[in-house]
Amino acid sequence: MKITILAVGSEAQYQPTFDTAYQYLKKETADLSAELSYAICRPEAAELFAALRTATGQSEAVVLLLSPEPAAVSTALRVVCSGLERTASVDAALQRQLETRAARMGLTLGYEQLPDLASFPAGAVPLPNEQGLVQGYAIPARRQLLLALPALPGELSAMFPSAV
């Protein structure tokens, strides 16, 4: 089995975070005897679309590790929806929860950022992140699996064993 991990976000800001998350996923998938590959993509639609297209052509599973920067989440959502020809829908209850959680964390998010954090592609299985703002989801497609997961290691390790 081949798994491609695409970390989405600023390499300058998040490379140590991505590296730690990759090592965690490598450990968690060791029982699968999977071959893992890993790349970092800027949150730019054309670059991510090309990387995702290549990865889906070469792997049984693709994992998008999403940095907490809003551009990473929104770009990944749009690219996944475009590539799979699906629409995104906002979970209004989750959006309210995330707004409250962000306030508790002392973060101010723009009104336009909250819907993307609470949106999922049609047909995706939500993978809740109870600790942070970046939510996960899984999309089984043909003989492949696409996962979008938070890149922050504490959030990833808290949700991965139970959700994935």
Which residues make up each language-model segment?
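Short strand-loop junctions, especially beta-strand C-caps/beta-turns
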Residues: 8-11, 67, 151
